[in-house]
């Protein structure tokens, strides 16, 4: 293999796929990038077998085509220190290659491409949909924090994509809270679904640039691929059946609180300083036109409360929550005011933006209360 390429373009390419390089792997070959040069296109692959990232970049000149596996860390470290300039990569023998630039060169080892695991994507049964990039990244951002770390129920460790004839809903839950993000911009000819693990979901959110307009999503029973621009993300799907989340969404919560989101968030943060650090319990006392939030830790003889003006339409109600869950949900909503809907002190509360949402998107959160003394 021999090629000439811009050092900055090569750096962009390797950085785009580097998140798939495993920190530790039983297969040392996976600590390498796979370079595949065909014509004037260099395809760069990184994988941990569960997640694979591929990207293509144009080279300035191809002298000899080829495929080699190059050490990822050494390659990235070298490129980060080089100013933008033409870089020549040339294999000199069966085990090393030279990176040369205007004033110097570096010798690095390489490994046969045949040693790199074969990466397979989706099969002929795959369902394909077009997903607006902004909706995909917003959907992931709005739900990923609610995923679980559950060894017994691995399905809860990912985001559930529920694709319907009229809309698509992204769902995540850790049993204490549940978040749904729905968009009508994504539809399918027939109902379909898959569970995307939180790791590839986080990487997708990070690498889909603002200039990307649409992502092509294809999935079968085992794998999913996300294609945008010159980048392909291939990931193993979570195996398992996702719970019937629609059954737990409250439909008849008639006690309604409307309040400024940031004001409520900051109040919960202040009051929770005095909550018991093991339980993180806080209490909402709701009366007409007012909300009092309180917390205490009897072990340290500390307590706090704060009254907040609000709109409340319903019966007087006292209900308890774990403060971190309230903080997470409010922090991840992008709106001026929120509405919380309650039925009683023992059943789930609904949290959603108060403003009129765009017709194509909406989000809601569900949080379980805790028993209070």
Regions found by a protein language model. Give the residues of each.
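Structural preference for solvent-exposed beta-strand-turn elements
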Residues: 1-373
């Amino acid at each position: 293999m021999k090629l000439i390429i811009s050092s900055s373009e090569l750096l962009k390419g390797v950085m785009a796929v580097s998140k798939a390089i495993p920190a530790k792997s039983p297969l040392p070959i996976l600590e390498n990038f796979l370079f595949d040069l065909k014509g004037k296109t260099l395809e760069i692959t990184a994988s941990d077998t569960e997640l694979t990232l591929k990207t293509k970049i144009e080279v300035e000149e191809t002298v000899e085509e080829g495929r080699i596996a190059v050490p990822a860390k050494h390659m990235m470290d070298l490129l980060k220190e080089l100013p933008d300039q033409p870089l020549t990569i040339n294999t000199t023998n069966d085990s090393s290659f030279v990176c040369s630039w205007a004033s110097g060169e570096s010798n690095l080892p390489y490994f046969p491409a045949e040693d790199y695991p074969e990466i397979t994507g989706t099969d002929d049964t795959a369902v394909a949909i077009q997903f607006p990039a902004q909706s995909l990244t917003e959907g992931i951002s709005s739900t990923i924090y609610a995923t679980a770390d559950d060894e017994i129920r691995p399905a809860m460790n990912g985001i559930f994509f529920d694709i319907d004839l009229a809309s698509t809903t992204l769902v995540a839950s850790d049993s204490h809270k549940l978040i749904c993000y729905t968009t009508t911009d994504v539809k399918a000819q027939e109902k379909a679904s898959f569970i995307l693990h939180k790791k590839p979901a986080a990487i997708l959110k990070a690498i889909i640039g603002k200039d990307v307009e649409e992502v092509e999503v294809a999935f079968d029973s085992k794998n999913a691929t996300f294609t945008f621009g010159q980048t392909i993300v291939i990931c193993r799907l979570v195996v398992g059946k996702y719970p019937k989340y629609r059954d737990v969404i409250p439909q008849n919560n008639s006690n309604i609180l409307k309040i400024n989101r940031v004001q409520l968030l900051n109040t919960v943060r202040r009051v929770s300083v005095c909550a018991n650090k093991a339980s993180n319990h806080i209490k909402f006392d709701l009366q007409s036109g007012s909300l009092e939030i309180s917390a205490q830790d009897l072990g340290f003889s500390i307590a706090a409360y704060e009254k907040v003006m609000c709109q409340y339409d319903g019966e007087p109600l006292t209900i308890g929550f774990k403060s971190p869950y309230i903080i997470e949900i409010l922090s991840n909503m992008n709106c001026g005011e929120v509405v919380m809907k309650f039925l009683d002190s023992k059943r789930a509360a609904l949290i959603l933006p108060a403003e009129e949402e765009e017709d194509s998107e909406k989000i809601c959160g569900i949080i379980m209360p805790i028993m209070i003394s």
